[in-house]
């Protein structure tokens, strides 16, 4: 199972973006040429564009969901691209095939 390095954006926002046979993605296979939806995990800040996909993620006291401690299954790649653009583009990490790897301007 291939894991992609953590995505870090120009403004400091970071998240895991995965697609493989064990991830919540579509297609749910290893090494697809292109994915239509991917799994986001554990962003370092709450991101409104992905909140509707949040699963679990409860705080230590169990009272409220914590968006930074959650997995976001089956997020459309177009939404991931919007998140990257909103945060100034990628300065580090890698996204699965099908996600536009929007890089921050040099």
Each PLM stretch: what is its role?
Residues 7, 17, 40-42, 80, ...:
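Generic structural hydrophobic/aromatic packing signal, biased to beta-strands
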Residues 28-51:
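Short secondary-structure subsegments characteristic of cysteine-rich extracellular domains
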Residues 1-34:
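Amphipathic, interaction-prone secondary-structure segments
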